[in-house]
Each structure stands twice: as structure tokens, then as C-alpha cells.
């Protein structure tokens, strides 16, 4: 569907060359909801603009449905861009026009008759849940409603791809969830391929089936959402995921609050992560029956990501030291990732033990 091959983007600032995107290769399949995540300045917004040549790459190829965009004439490129819709953080609505007219403007230069355009606009407004706001003006709408108008406008040309550049960044959490639910519906109902640019891993977790992580213009890690969330390799990816899963907040509370001090004395504080069918197995209960190691759960979270269960626990382990080591080995053999956070109440450099089958 979308192929980016060896993409580089450089900007000249006086005598200095800024390389915003460095040797990026991406493959996005039809029907994907593909998240590209990174901090500000990572190059993700530049990269998404390359996908429809709003930003021409310094080098590399952009291929959409087998067509290399860089080889098209201006007329051919304009035609190809109709298959690629785009929405932004800011809505760019025309304040003096009604919601109906804002969407209709996208159809102004098509060959559709006035009646066909009216029917199309009404269909789009119904699709995004704004059929009752057709005669309203942008100033009468909330931020979430304005973004729905922008989505309807972007869908006017019946695109196969929708590029979303920080589309939820200006919205509150509840409205963000509603917009993401709408995008998911469009993906499923229309078969729309969506590329989502964001700095929030929570957004990726909620909607994306694949994700790429960018840092300093490079894609440092990419894969399925389940793969990235269950076994992140890069430090930056781990930081993003820990923020999205609230593990660090739980750890801070556990390690700083007096109420937990006695529970950490002469015990190991361990973080456990597991995925898929492992969440169905009573592994914690078996630690005592097999090794006489008691596990006290201080924090736990199980959630579904792309219909796959992901679990995270923070536990204390007590018992004979050699038995604790055997218990950890058993967890690892069962496919659990274990991170020893503290030993006997003393903080230590985290030791990550990766389990897998």
C-alpha cells in the first residue's frame, strides 16, 4: 500500500544542513492503522508529509499502490493525492461557512452535480456523527466536533489512505478517545488505511496494529503493536510504553511511601510482564507450591491490545534465596519477562531477564 524506501529529508538553514529524516524504510499494508510515535523534533511530521509529497524527500522513493510518486507529473500527482486524505492538529475550517459548506468546498472542483454533492456531504456528516450540525458554524462546535468536520472533509474524495498528523494533540482525553473510536470505525467500515502521527503511546495502544518509533530522524524500532508493547528493545520505546502503562507511577508510589517499606524488607521487588495465553496460567500461585516462594502483588494490570492480553505485575518475592532464583527461572521458562528492581529493600541497577518460548 505505502512503501517508503531509503527516505532522507534535509533542510538548509544558513550554512547549516539539518537532516530531519534519515534513511527511513517503512512498509504499510492496506487496512493497517499504523502509528508513528516520537518526541517533538523526531521527524515524524516531516515523514508523514513525505507520504503525499507535501514534503519532497531529498532522496529515496515514495510508492503508493505500486506508483512511485516522485516520477509523476504535477497533474498526475494531483490526481494521485485524491486517494490520500489528511488531517492535522489544527482544523483549518472556514469560520464564515457552515459545516455543510466546509465539507462541500472539497467537492467544488469535482464533476459531481449539485445534487450529488449535497448527497455526498450529507453521507459524510452522518458518517462522522454530525448530521445535525450541517447548518452550524465552526465557532459553535467543540474541538472534537471540529476535528470530525476535518475528517469528513478529508474523506470527500473517497481516499484509500488517511494521514493524521497529531490529530488528537489539541483534544482532551475523553474527546481523544471519541475521535480514535471514529477512526477505528472508518478503518473497519471503509477499509481505510490510517497513518497516525503522535507523541502519545496511549493513542498507539488504543487504535494501532503496527507502530514505528522515531528518534532524531531515524526509525529506531518498528513492528506489531503487541510485539512492541510486550518486548520493546530500545530505551526510548521502553520509556514510551512505561508511561502508557502507568508502571513508573506505581513504582514511584511503592518505593517512596512508608506503607510499603516493611513489605520490601528482606524481599525482592520484581516486575513481571507477560503476553497472550501466559495471562491464563496461574504462574504466581505455582511459585509457592513448587518453590515455597511467596509472591505479594503490589500492582497489577491486564489489558487487551489487538485482542491479545498483556499483563504487568509488580510483586515482592520472599523465601529462601536459592528458591527465589529457581522461581524466577521457572517464570522465564514460562515466557515471562522479569525485571529485578530491588533486592532486600535496597535499590539496585535493574536486571532484565527475558523469557520466551
Feature map (PLM): residue ranges:
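Conserved signature/switch motifs of ABC ATPase nucleotide-binding domains
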Residues: 136-139, 156-157, 164
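Conserved ABC transporter NBD signature motif
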Residues: 60-68
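Conserved ABC ATPase "signature" region
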Residues: 68, 104, 108, 115-132
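A short, surface-exposed alpha-helical micro-motif characterized by mixed small hydrophobic
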Residues: 204-206
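ABC ATPase "signature
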Residues: 222-223, 231
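ABC ATPase NBD coupling module
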Residues: 69-85, 109, 114-115, 228-232
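Helix-to-loop junction immediately C-terminal to a conserved catalytic motif
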Residues: 52
Amino acid at each position: 500500500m505505502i512503501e517508503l524506501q531509503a527516505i532522507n529529508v534535509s533542510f538548509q538553514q544558513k550554512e547549516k544542513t539539518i537532516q530531519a529524516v534519515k534513511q527511513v524504510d517503512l512498509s504499510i499494508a492496506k487496512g493497517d492503522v499504523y502509528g508513528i510515535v516520537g518526541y517533538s523534533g523526531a521527524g515524524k511530521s516531516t515523514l508523514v508529509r513525505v507520504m503525499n509529497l507535501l514534503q519532497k524527500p531529498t532522496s529515496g522513493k515514495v510508492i503508493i499502490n505500486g506508483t512511485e510518486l516522485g516520477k509523476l507529473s504535477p497533474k498526475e500527482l494531483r490526481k494521485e493525492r485524491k486517494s490520500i486524505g489528511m488531517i492535522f492538529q489544527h482544523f483549518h475550517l472556514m469560520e464564515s461557512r457552515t459545516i455543510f459548506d466546509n465539507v462541500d468546498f472539497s467537492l467544488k472542483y469535482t464533476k459531481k452535480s449539485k445534487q450529488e454533492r449535497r448527497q455526498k456531504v450529507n453521507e459524510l456528516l452522518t458518517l462522522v456523527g454530525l448530521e445535525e450540525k450541517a447548518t452550524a458554524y465552526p465557532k459553535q462546535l467543540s474541538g472534537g466536533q471540529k476535528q470530525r468536520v476535518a475528517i469528513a472533509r478529508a474523506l470527500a474524495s473517497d481516499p484509500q489512505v488517511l494521514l493524521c498528523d497529531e490529530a488528537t494533540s489539541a483534544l482532551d482525553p475523553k474527546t481523544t478517545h471519541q475521535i480514535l473510536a471514529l477512526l477505528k470505525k472508518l478503518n473497519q467500515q471503509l477499509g481505510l488505511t490510517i497513518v497516525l502521527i503522535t507523541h502519545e503511546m496511549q493513542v498507539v495502544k488504543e487504535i494501532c496494529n503496527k507502530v514505528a518509533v522515531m528518534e532524531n530522524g531515524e526509525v529506531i524500532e518498528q513492528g506489531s503493536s503487541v510485539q512492541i508493547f510486550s518486548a520493546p528493545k530500545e530505551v526510548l520505546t521502553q520509556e514510551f510504553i512505561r508511561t502508557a502503562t502507568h508502571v513508573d507511577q506505581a513504582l514511584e508510589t511503592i518505593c517512596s511511601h512508608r506503607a510499603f517499606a516493611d513489605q520490601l524488607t528482606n524481599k525482592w521487588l520484581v516486575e513481571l510482564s507477560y503476553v497472550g495465553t501466559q495471562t491464563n496460567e496461574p504462574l504466581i500461585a505455582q511459585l509457592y507450591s513448587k518453590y515455597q516462594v511467596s509472591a505479594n502483588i503490589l500492582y497489577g494490570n491486564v489489558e487487551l491490545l489487538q485482542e491479545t492480553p498483556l499483563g504487568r505485575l509488580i510483586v515482592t518475592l520472599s523465601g529462601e534465596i536459592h528458591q527465589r532464583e529457581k522461581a524466577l527461572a521457572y517464570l522465564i521458562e514460562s515466557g515471562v519477562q522479569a525485571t529485578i528492581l530491588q533486592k532486600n529493600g535496597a535499590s539496585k541497577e535493574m536486571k532484565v531477564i527475558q523469557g520466551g518460548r
